[in-house]
Amino acid sequence: RQLSISVTAFRPSHPYYIERLGIHIASSQELCYVIYNNPLLAMEGLINDNLITFIRTELDMAFLAGKLDVCKKSGEDPDEMIFIILQECYYYTAREIGKFRQKIASYKKMSAAELTKETADFYFRLKQYGTAVIYYEKILDDWRIKSLSDEFTAKIWNNIGASYAGIFWFEKAMSAFDMSYNFQKNRETLKKIYQLTLLNPELTL
């Protein structure tokens, strides 16, 4: 679905800034689009008091803001606020919202490590490599590390290496790829290590 807003549509005087994406939103349609296409971000506390205030005062949607306040104070699953917004704004069809609800449910069925990896991968795709590393390392720092397979652990270290390479911190990238190879002898990992030595001759195999 392509987001297309009429130039004659109501526009708030103070757009809402979503720091994680580095964008401003200025309509309920844009908010729904962001939520629908970034479910992990929506699950990570996107809907807070500041956003609810924006919905009430800038979008002039007091009824929706009131429903969100009630849900927030009731102690219900915070993710219900996501669905309230999608349902009340009528930007997506009931079928689309149903598919989105299934996507959220699939995330909730994941283990803590798997969900954290999905979140890290999300930030990696956004090229927010520093944030991605924080989430990848959170998995490794967790005591559950002993229950992770060597294959999964190798993937985490590989992605840490790719993240560091993305910010040109080649020494850190080399160390991470080395760790990945220690857990799983993968030829692709060796290729990445070799490529790093070409980018930085001071690094050695």
What is the predicted role of each segment?
Residues 2-111:
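Long, contiguous interaction/recruitment modules in multidomain scaffold/adaptor proteins
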Residues 138-144, 179-183:
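Amphipathic alpha-helical segments of tetratricopeptide repeats
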Residues 103-107, 141-151:
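Flexible helix-coil transition and linker loops at the boundaries of alpha-helical arrays
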Residues 126, 167, 200-201:
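Structural motif corresponding to the intra-repeat A-B loop/turn of tetratricopeptide repeats
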